[in-house]
């Protein structure tokens, strides 16, 4: 979770109260104050609330929670007359673009620092290290529309931010600090994303670096915002959060036409919720009018429909509200968790570790002893990662998400190994060797069961290495196994094997297929094994 550094003077100015009140209120809103200094407060927010990753967003929420300013923030968006065109050649590179014009910005150093912090936090929380989303902020008065988002030749030159000489895009990836850090996102493509103005001047090379031409300073008054990415919802979320933050700075928002589509859309989402369900779920007795007051403290628009129904307007920046229960959680936060009365359970019981957790602890101890580092991948993944990239047939027993919010999270994982391969891909710029493992639940046909997997990548990884690691793991788990020929196309024929116990297949191991390595963007040989742990859960 990101640590948000809040300037005390700026935060109190935005909130309208003193820093002591702010610091005492933040934990009750679901955050954790990490450090308190004379001029700065460091706060850790949960990843589901990226709208709080700035002094502006935090102040907006605090004003509601403290009753200083409640209800739905409203955002007037005027047309700017500025347009963007998107090159169809970007379809398989970085196809999505969001934008807005920010007028009448009067920025001091605290505002610039807050904006830069929000930008980087969104790159982490929403953008997955700029792969899914990257943000560009430009001084609009230095450039002219209409603007073009194009797939440019790799030899295109411009002066990158913090430099005073022109460089080709290839040179930027090889030499510029930001280029070296994020080259992995675009280096595989024949052409690179580029944003230019009406005169062909370069504004940005997303997701790598802006041009020095459009640097934002304290003298900047009008801003062009660009957000590019590979997932349209994530792009839209980032644009909305940034626009809402600029409004807190006193700026005005104007829309941009992107191939005829207007951006941003800052209208609230409407939803109706049940008062009785909220009371039952939270344990807080309340009426419809009381629930309305609580939700308005959390900056929702709320109106009583009848004694059990409340109409809710969800602010555009609240990307975390995906279910009625998310609204009920906010009502409980506004009520105050410290005010909820505790009660003893009606019966006395003694807790003990769950057998599956005991098994996982044993697996962790063994793998750490074998010099592997634990990885904790997400439970939700995609069919592309689990099957297509692994050269495996789609599993008909996979449980699909009905309304996925991201193309990366469409199924509940049925295997652990594909997620380890994805982790190796994300960390391919790190030093070798990398030896990682993970253990956790997978789901097939609505049945949840435990699995583990391990993977190793380095210049000399081979079948003998992973066979030895798998054998050591099985011996320490007291697993008596036999190896048979495998037909798993995720591994190289002749350098793979299935693991059998009592005539039943429980796993697979071997050298990863070169085609799989290419799919994940890996340049070195990798080896891996995966084992179904269902048969080793103790009944004690």
From Swiss-Prot:
Catalytic activity: tRNA(Phe) + L-phenylalanine + ATP = L-phenylalanyl-tRNA(Phe) + AMP + diphosphate + H(+)
Keywords noted in UniProt: Aminoacyl-tRNA synthetase, ATP-binding, Cytoplasm, Ligase, Magnesium, Metal-binding, Nucleotide-binding, Protein biosynthesis
GO BP: any one term: phenylalanyl-tRNA aminoacylation
Subcellular location(s) of the protein: Cytoplasm
Enzyme class name: ligase
Signal peptide positions (record): none
SMART domains: B3_4, B5
Domain B5: 266-342
Tree of life domain: Archaea
E.C. number(s) listed in UniProt: 6.1.1.20
GO CC field: phenylalanine-tRNA ligase complex
Residues engaged in binding Mg(2+): 320, 326, 329-330
Cofactor(s) this protein requires: Mg(2+)
GO MF term (any one): magnesium ion binding
Family: Belongs to the phenylalanyl-tRNA synthetase beta subunit family. Type 2 subfamily.
Subunit structure: Tetramer of two alpha and two beta subunits.
Protein name (database record): Phenylalanine--tRNA ligase beta subunit
Lineage: Archaea, Methanobacteriati, Methanobacteriota, Stenosarchaea group, Methanomicrobia
Name of the gene encoding the protein in the UniProt record: pheT
């Amino acid at each position: 979770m990101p640590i948000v550094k809040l300037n005390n003077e700026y935060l109190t100015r935005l909130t309208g109260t003193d820093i002591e009140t702010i610091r005492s209120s933040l934990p009750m809103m679901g955050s954790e104050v990490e450090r308190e200094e004379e001029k700065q407060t460091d706060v850790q927010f949960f990843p589901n609330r990226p709208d709080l990753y700035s002094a502006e967003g935090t102040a907006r929420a605090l004003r509601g929670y403290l009753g200083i300013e409640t209800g739905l923030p409203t955002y007037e968006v005027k047309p700017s007359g500025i347009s963007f065109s998107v090159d169809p050649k970007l379809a398989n590179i970085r196809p999505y673009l969001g934008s807005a014009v920010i007028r009448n910005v009067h920025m001091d150093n605290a505002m610039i620092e807050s904006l830069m912090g929000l930008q980087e936090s969104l790159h982490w929380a929403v953008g997955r290290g700029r792969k899914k989303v990257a943000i560009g902020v430009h001084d609009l008065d230095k450039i002219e529309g209409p603007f073009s988002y194009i797939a440019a030749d790799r030899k295109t030159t411009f002066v990158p931010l913090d430099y005073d000489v022109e460089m080709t895009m290839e040179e930027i990836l090889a030499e510029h600090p930001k280029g070296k850090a994020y080259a992995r996102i675009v280096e595989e493509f024949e052409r690179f994303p580029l944003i230019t103005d009406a005169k062909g001047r370069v504004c940005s090379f997303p997701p790598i670096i802006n041009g020095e031409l459009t640097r934002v300073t304290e003298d900047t008054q009008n801003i062009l915002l660009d957000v590019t990415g590979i997932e349209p919802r994530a792009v839209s979320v980032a644009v909305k959060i940034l626009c809402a933050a600029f409004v807190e700075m006193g700026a005005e928002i104007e829309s941009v036409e992107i191939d005829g589509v207007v951006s941003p859309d800052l209208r609230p989402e409407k939803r109706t919720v049940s008062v009785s369900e909220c009371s039952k779920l939270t344990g807080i007795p309340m009426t419809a009018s009381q629930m309305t007051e609580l939700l308005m403290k959390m900056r929702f628009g709320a109106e009583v429909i009848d004694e059990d129904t409340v109409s809710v307007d969800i602010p555009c920046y609240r990307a975390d509200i995906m279910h009625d229960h998310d609204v009920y959680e906010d009502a409980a936060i506004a009520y105050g968790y410290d005010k909820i009365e505790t009660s003893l359970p009606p019966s006395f019981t003694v807790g003990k570790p769950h057998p599956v957790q005991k098994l996982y602890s044993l697996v962790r101890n063994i793998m750490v002893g074998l010099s592997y580092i634990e990885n904790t991948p997400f439970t939700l993944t995609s069919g592309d990662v689990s099957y297509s990239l692994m050269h495996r047939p789609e599993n008909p027993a996979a449980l699909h998400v009905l309304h996925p919010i991201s193309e990366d999270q469409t199924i509940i994982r049925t295997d652990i190994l594909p997620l380890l391969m994805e982790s190796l891909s994300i960390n391919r710029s790190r030093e070798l060797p990398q030896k990682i493992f993970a253990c956790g639940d997978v789901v097939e046909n609505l049945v949840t069961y435990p699995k583990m997997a391990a993977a190793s990548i380095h210049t000399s990884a081979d079948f003998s290495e992973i066979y030895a690691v798998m054998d050591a793991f099985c011996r320490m788990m007291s697993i008596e196994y036999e190896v048979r020929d495998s037909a798993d196309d995720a591994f190289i024929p002749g350098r793979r094997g299935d693991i059998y116990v009592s005539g039943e297949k429980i796993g697979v191991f071997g050298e990863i297929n070169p085609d799989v390595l290419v799919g994940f963007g890996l340049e070195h040989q990798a080896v891996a094994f995966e084992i179904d742990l269902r048969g080793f859960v103790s009944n004690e």
